[in-house]
């Protein structure tokens, strides 16, 4: 069950990430330039390249911030009476964390609703991201999910030219539910780049 849930949330996040970079051509170009510099067009991106691609990783972080796949993190139970945000919470109370709201809070993030992957170049910004939870109860698959997402998005950027369908920006409205899916599924046009042709030979 856990693996299926992880696969679903990764697919949802990848769709959001591609939507974001297609709406922000300057972000797409910077990610492509980073890939060209460190990987090139003679071979495919590999897992071992990811440590040299901080901007690609920041795109995923920023996507997870704005479009957390599970907007309400897994429920927790208070082990003892405590105060949360000024509210008295009795022992054994189910507590939900609204990551979606925290990730868009202007008191926590500058330009909170803007897609800006470069924000994670600043010291301490990553510590505020709670897409995988925090501490001992954080998602055990967070590291694996990050690698899979970076590799997938990186390969899509490396191997294909991408264009939006028409001139209008991609609709970024969300569908409410257990996972934060797009209201309108992403439609985009792609064309293979030379690296694909080289691999076929």
PLM features per residue range, with description:
Residues 4, 45-54, 83-87, 121, ...:
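Conserved, non-catalytic sequence blocks in retroelement Pol enzymes and Pol-derived host proteins
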Residues 9-27, 32-34, 142-159:
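Cytochrome P450 catalytic-core helices
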Residues 25, 44-86, 106, 113:
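Conserved cytochrome P450 K-helix E-x-x-R motif and the immediately C-terminal K′/meander segment
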Residues 31, 63, 89-92, 115, ...:
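Hydrophobic, well-ordered secondary-structure elements that form the walls
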Residues 36-38, 124, 132, 136-138, ...:
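Cytochrome P450 proximal C-terminal region
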Residues 37-41, 65, 69-73, 121, ...:
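Conserved helix-loop functional segments at active or binding sites
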Residues 67, 79, 97-123:
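Conserved cytochrome P450 K-helix/beta-meander segment immediately N-terminal to the heme-binding cysteine loop
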Residues 85, 92, 97-98, 191:
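Generic beta-strand/beta-sheet core signal
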């Amino acid at each position: 069950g856990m693996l299926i849930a992880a696969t679903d949330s990764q697919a949802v996040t990848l769709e959001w990430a591609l939507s974001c970079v297609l709406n922000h051509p300057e972000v797409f170009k910077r990610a492509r330039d980073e890939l060209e510099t460190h990987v090139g067009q003679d071979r495919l991106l590999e897992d071992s390249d990811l440590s040299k691609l901080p901007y690609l990783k920041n795109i995923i972080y920023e996507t997870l911030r704005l479009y957390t796949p599970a907007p309400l993190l897994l429920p927790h139970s208070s082990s003892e009476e405590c105060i949360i945000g000024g509210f008295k919470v009795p022992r054994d109370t189910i507590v939900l964390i609204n990551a979606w709201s925290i990730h868009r809070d202007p008191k926590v993030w500058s330009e909170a609703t803007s897609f800006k992957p470069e924000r994670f170049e600043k010291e301490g910004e990553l510590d505020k991201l709670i897409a995988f939870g925090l501490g001992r109860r954080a998602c055990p698959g967070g590291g694996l999910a990050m690698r899979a997402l970076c590799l997938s998005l990186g390969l899509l950027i490396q191997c294909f030219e991408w264009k939006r369908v028409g001139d209008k920006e991609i609709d970024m409205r969300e569908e409410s539910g257990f996972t934060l899916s797009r209201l309108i599924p992403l439609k985009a046009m792609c064309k293979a780049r030379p690296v694909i042709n080289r691999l076929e030979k």
